[in-house]
């Protein structure tokens, strides 16, 4: 038997400036399931994380609330810890970047980089908020991306195209703090010489450490040439002062990833059998994995490995990147009640419902994951209650009534139990590859076979026949053993269900290797319902409560609707028109037959629209909001049907579809209510 693997795993650090929401939880649940699988298999797998507790945002929020930054991050850490615990995210240590360990390691790594010649110093022209009397951190400047032209982007990187840049490259900058137009002032800054590591990064990023799609994106940045990275910020700033440089602080993205190391060191200092160097030394044979979202790939796949290489530490074994979460096919929305905080979800629903749904959707790629609330209810109720738990509930009563709760030794379906045994390696491979969706499909396929076999044997009918009781006991004992196998396979995803099943089965905590055996002549405990169906009313209550969270947050922050800063304030209602002018516009329901990108056009999609007997070709500037045009296929929308055709570079546009929003990614194509038909007039 091979030696247990030594694995250290991290998730991205949640920022200590707000609540955890379901988009965040996607990553922590994904990581937790993988860690639990490794532990389930007998490997030494350590999962550490921390709150990302530095930066201007925290300093400014604390100032606004009249408390110290230290008090703020302590309050937020308590909230985060409670949310994670109730979602069954089982960290071995959850620390803070505002810690002695992180200060020590950040200073050490910086000084090692400096001694090796990887730190440069020069004066830069930096934005300064004339109203707040402070230099502006990158995330407190907003404007237009200099690379792709997307509006409302932060001063350090573009969430649309992934480009990184200096804040001074941003077009039309505004202070996100005061709204003032910032002025430029000179300041002495410190830079990490990232280009020193170009060759190493080209090799490392193609060594299997990244998914192919991520490696391809990184290659684009590498091919464009790396730039020195500004790692300093000016006072006032909440963070660690750079050694020997009064008034200069480490940029939060320097000490944040070092927080992984600091959290592990904090754990090592309290755990004698753990050796920090065994996991972080240059020659470490332990495995190191970071789970992150695709929005922070550049920091983890470029800056972080270069910092580690330059300071004499080991680099990650792999970086697992996931996509964003959408809800009902769209970005999470506070007004629609789909921007759901972790706490709001927990107030209404079991964490295991969401854990299973995420698992059923998470592949090993970087595609976005959609939480469709109707599908969520149907899938959980069908798979977990209707398939898995149903097996135990079908069989347990007969065993308790007919054999005092004792499983007989006879295996009534050896071919089926052998099939379950044979499926284990494939399921394990799917877990290992982080292809949770495939693992869940294979497990539910087994559950379908078990239910079909029990239905075919119909112990409820046999039990009414004279002399069939022994056969009933054999069938039900086999059914309970099949249920036990499913629980073993699902335990990394559903630890609460597994614990309740272990209590019913009257067994010690199940491990992966237990799948190779069957229970026989074994006493069961009383069967109690293991999981209840999701009530759609509770889902609706959750979304309603999320809308209430929005109202509460507006009240807490002194916001009001819509006079001060709502949509009408941004885009006032146009001048009145006569009814006849409006009546001249012919609005129709249209079916999007096909949506496709237009070669050579950055913003346009070509829409083929069906008006109920007539097709139209329409060009629409909505590509930024719908990067995957195929998702629009088959959708109903609204169009101006009598707009004079317009000749464009790419063809003739025969109308205009209707959408809301300020532009860029925030465009929302309008749709009629269900039941509307293509070609119907909109009145």
From Swiss-Prot:
Cofactor descriptive note: Binds 1 zinc ion per subunit.
Listed GO MF terms: ATP binding; metal ion binding; methionine-tRNA ligase activity; tRNA binding
Main EC class the enzyme belongs to: ligase
PROSITE patterns per the UniProt record, alphabetical: AA_TRNA_LIGASE_I, TRBD
Chief site of localization: cytoplasm
Record motif 'KMSKS' region, residues: 331-335
EC annotation from Swiss-Prot or TrEMBL: 6.1.1.10
Residues that coordinate or bind Zn(2+): 145, 148, 158, 161
Keywords: Aminoacyl-tRNA synthetase, ATP-binding, Cytoplasm, Ligase, Metal-binding, Nucleotide-binding, Protein biosynthesis, RNA-binding, tRNA-binding, Zinc
Domain tRNA-binding: 581-683
Role, per record: Is required not only for elongation of protein synthesis but also for the initiation of all mRNA translation through initiator tRNA(fMet) aminoacylation.
Protein name, per record: Methionine--tRNA ligase
């Amino acid at each position: 038997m091979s030696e247990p693997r030594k694995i250290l795993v991290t998730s991205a650090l949640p920022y200590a400036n707000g609540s955890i929401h379901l988009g965040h939880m996607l990553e922590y649940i994904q990581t937790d399931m993988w860690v639990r699988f490794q532990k389930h298999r007998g490997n030494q797998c350590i999962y550490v994380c921390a709150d990302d507790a530095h930066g201007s945002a925290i300093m400014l929020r604390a100032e606004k609330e009249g408390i110290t930054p230290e008090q703020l991050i302590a309050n937020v850490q308590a909230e985060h810890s409670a949310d994670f615990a109730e979602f069954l995210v089982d960290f071995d240590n959850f620390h803070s970047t505002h810690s002695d360990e992180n200060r020590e390691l950040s200073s050490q790594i910086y000084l090692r980089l400096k001694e090796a010649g990887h730190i440069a110093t020069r004066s830069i022209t930096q934005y300064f908020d004339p109203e707040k009397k402070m230099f502006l951190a990158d995330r407190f400047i907003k404007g237009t991306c200099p690379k792709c032209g997307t509006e409302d982007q932060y001063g350090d990187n573009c969430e649309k195209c992934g480009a990184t840049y200096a804040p001074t490259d941003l077009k039309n900058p505004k202070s996100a703090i005061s709204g003032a137009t910032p002025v430029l002032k000179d300041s002495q800054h410190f830079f990490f010489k990232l280009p020193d590591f170009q060759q190493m990064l080209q090799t490392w990023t193609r060594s299997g450490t990244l998914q192919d799609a991520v490696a391809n994106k990184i290659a684009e940045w590498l091919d464009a040439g790396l730039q020195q990275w500004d790692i300093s910020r000016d006072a006032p700033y909440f963070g660690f002062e750079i050694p020997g440089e009064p008034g200069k602080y480490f940029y939060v993205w320097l000490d944040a990833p070092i927080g992984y190391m600091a959290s592990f060191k904090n754990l090592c200092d309290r755990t004698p059998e753990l050796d920090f160097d065994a996991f972080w030394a240059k020659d470490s044979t332990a495995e190191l994995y970071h789970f992150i979202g695709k929005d922070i790939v550049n920091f983890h796949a470029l800056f972080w490995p270069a910092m580690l290489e330059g300071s004499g530490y080991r680099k990650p074994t792999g970086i697992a990147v996931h996509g964003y979460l959408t809800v009902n096919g769209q970005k999470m929305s506070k007004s629609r009640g789909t921007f759901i905080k972790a706490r709001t979800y927990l107030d209404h629903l079991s964490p295991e419902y969401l854990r299973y749904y995420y698992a059923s959707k998470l592949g090993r790629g970087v595609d976005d994951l959609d939480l469709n609330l109707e599908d969520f209810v149907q899938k959980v109720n069908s798979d977990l209650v209707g398939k898995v738990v149903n097996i135990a509930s079908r069989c347990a009563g007969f065993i308790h009534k007919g054999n005092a709760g004792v499983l007989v030794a006879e295996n009534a379906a050896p071919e089926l139990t052998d099939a379950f045994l044979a499926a284990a390696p494939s399921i394990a491979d799917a877990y290992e590859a982080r292809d949770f969706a495939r693992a869940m499909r294979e497990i539910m396929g087994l559950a379908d076979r078990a239910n079909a076999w029990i239905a075919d044997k119909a112990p409820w009918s046999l039990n009414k026949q004279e002399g069939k009781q022994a056969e009933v006991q054999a069938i039900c004992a086999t059914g309970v053993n099949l249920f036990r196998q499913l629980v073993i396979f699902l335990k990394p995803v559903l630890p609460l269900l597994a614990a309740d099943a272990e209590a019913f089965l009257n067994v010690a905590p199940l491990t992966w290797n237990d799948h190779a055996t069957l229970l026989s002549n074994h006493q069961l405990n009383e069967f109690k319902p293991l999981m209840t169906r999701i009530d759609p009313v509770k889902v609706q209550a959750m979304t309603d409560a999320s809308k209430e969270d929005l109202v509460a947050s507006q009240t807490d922050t002194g916001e009001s609707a819509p006079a001060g800063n709502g949509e009408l304030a941004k885009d006032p209602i146009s001048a009145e028109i006569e009814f006849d002018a409006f009546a001249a516009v012919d609005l129709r329901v249209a079916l999007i037959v096909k949506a496709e990108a237009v070669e050579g056009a950055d913003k346009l999609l070509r829409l083929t629209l069906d008006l109920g007997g007539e097709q139209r070709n329409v060009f629409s500037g909505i590509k930024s909001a719908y990067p995957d045009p195929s998702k629009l296929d088959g959708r109903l929308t609204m169009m101006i049907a009598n707009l004079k055709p317009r000749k464009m570079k790419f063809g003739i546009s025969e109308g205009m579809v209707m959408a809301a929003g300020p532009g860029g990614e925030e465009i929302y194509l309008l749709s009629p209510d269900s039941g509307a038909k293509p070609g119907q007039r909109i009145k």
